[in-house]
Amino acid sequence: MRVLRHKAFARLVAAYLVSQAGSKVHRVALLVLVYLLTENALWVSLVLGTQLLGTVVFSPLLSAWADTQDRKRLLVWSDLLRAPLVALIPLLGAQSLPALLLLVFLMELLRDLHDPIQNAVVPDLVPEEEVDEANGLILLADRISEVLFVGAAGVLVAWVGPAYAFYLDALTYLASGLLLAGLPPLKPQALPKAGYLERVKEGLGHLFRQPAVRRTVGTLFAAAAFGSVERSEEHTSELQSLMRISYAVFCLKK
């Protein structure tokens, strides 16, 4: 934990935990909202597929562009822009499922922009000899948030309902963005000589030229795709269980 003595890195970790808390609430509330609106596992699968599409197709394009930009500005604005988008989900998304899918897609694009930059700036915030420790702490924070925040998110959604959970999620993104605004400047280290499309092509070319990397990515993609379909079928019973929990919590509140 010595690495937390660096104030900028400690601020990054704090923003990460706040953002992760909101993301877990968002994940649970979104699935509950979709099921309440449709009572159809197909729409749950479409939501998961929309998220996967944003990550697989646009993440390489965003990463190549982000390399040449002010990374602090991207970190801050990718959080601040998610705040109004997530707040619109219960307002617009609940009225129109296509609008809901669009909001989910935009949220996923901002996440794909934010998360790689967040990991990439760690060496700029700590000494070189402490980079491994800092990365390990980020990984630990991710595992802790997965264990603690998902369970808490389920209870919160059951207690206040998905709509209010989205508003709380919006506040966490706002808080995270404000925390990140206190980071030191994070300019690109060096502007690459190659153009944007050339860098995208180079990254994709590396994927296709390396059989081991290609097989690994293909396996992960297939697992994610089929896993999303499988999870969509499982979500029906899981969300029904959550509905029962919601009813039990409602009775306790009375």
Residue ranges: model-predicted function:
Residues 239, 247-254:
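Hydrophobic alpha-helical segments, chiefly the membrane-spanning helices
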Residues 1-238, 244-246:
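Alpha-helical transmembrane-bundle signature of multi-pass membrane transport and export proteins
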